């Protein structure tokens, strides 16, 4: 999609495809961890990852 198409339709690709996810804890749209349908921003994921069962190896 080119810039002219975005200007003509007035929407971004994420809105067209229905991918309007946001962080479940803080509502942030950027830096999302969407794997396994987690949908937490990376900052929130770091805070709760251990409680969710993820292990840090380094």
From Swiss-Prot:
Sites where the protein binds Zn(2+): 23, 26, 41, 44
Keywords: Metal-binding, Ribonucleoprotein, Ribosomal protein, RNA-binding, rRNA-binding, Zinc
Cofactor: Zn(2+)
Pfam families per UniProt: Ribosomal_S14
Domain of life of the native organism: Archaea
Keyword Metal-binding: yes
Parts forming coiled coils: none
Annotated region (Disordered), positions in chain: 1-21
Gene Ontology biological process terms in this record: cytoplasmic translation
GO CC term (a single one): cytosolic small ribosomal subunit
SUPFAM superfamilies linked: Glucocorticoid receptor-like (DNA-binding domain)
Cofactor note: Binds 1 zinc ion per subunit.
Alphabetized PROSITE patterns for the sequence: RIBOSOMAL_S14
Gene Ontology molecular-function annotations: rRNA binding; structural constituent of ribosome; zinc ion binding
Sequence similarity: Belongs to the universal ribosomal protein uS14 family. Zinc-binding uS14 subfamily.
HAMAP family from the UniProt entry: Ribosomal_uS14_2_A
Function: Binds 16S rRNA, required for the assembly of 30S particles.
Subunit structure: Part of the 30S ribosomal subunit.
Protein name: Small ribosomal subunit protein uS14
Species this protein is from: Haloquadratum walsbyi (strain DSM 16790 / HBSQ001)
Lineage: Archaea, Methanobacteriati, Methanobacteriota, Stenosarchaea group, Halobacteria
């Amino acid at each position: 999609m080119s810039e002219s198409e975005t200007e003509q339709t007035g929407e971004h690709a994420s809105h067209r495809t229905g991918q309007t996810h946001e962080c479940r804890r803080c509502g942030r749209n950027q830096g999302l961890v969407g794997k396994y349908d987690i949908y937490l921003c990376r900052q929130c994921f770091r805070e709760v990852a251990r409680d969710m069962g993820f292990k840090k190896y380094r």
